[in-house]
UniProtKB/Swiss-Prot annotation:
The chain crosses the membrane at residues 1-21, 27-47, 48-68, 87-107, 139-159. This is NADH-ubiquinone oxidoreductase chain 6. InterPro entries: ComplexI_Subunit6, NADH_UbQ/plastoQ_OxRdtase_su6, Nuo/plastoQ_OxRdtase_6_NuoJ. GO terms for molecular function: NADH dehydrogenase (ubiquinone) activity. It holds the Pfam family Oxidored_q3. Belongs to the complex I subunit 6 family. It is an enzyme of class 7 (translocase).
Amino acid sequence: MTYFVLFLGLCFVLGGLAVASNPSPYYGVVGLVLASVAGCGWLLSLGASFVSLVLFMVYLGGMLVVFVYSVSLAADPFPEAWGDWRVIGYGMGFIVVLVVGVVISGFVEYWNFGVVTVDSVGMFSVRLDFSGVAMFYSWGVGMFLAAGWGLLLTLFVVLELVRGLSRGAIRAV
């Protein structure tokens, strides 16, 4: 099980690397799906099945919509692939930054950091991932509404930017 979790962590890092160094939006989707599946599998191995499923549906669904939109706007007849030297240089640069960050933070010395699961502890009868979602909707309702309002504002800004000088999605009647 330890090797499987280590493999999921490696896939998560490689998926994030693939998203960060993608040459075109066509190939960024592959890294996004890999990172999302590996991250949610990692949460699933820790026992957070509900949070893993919700994050997988929301994050992957939302990000795939963004990538589909950017793919439709990017009209590259010959998109760059991951085998180009410039993209390989970006990937190697990201790996060097990651290794330097790990060494500087001292994570290499502390392999026994302890992993806990989200099962109920002591007198609690509700799993911690379920109570976290309930607390998000009860205590975090203000931030939830502010984030929704910000996303709605962002949608209107993007629609106005895409519209340009012609009549677009928002028209004066």
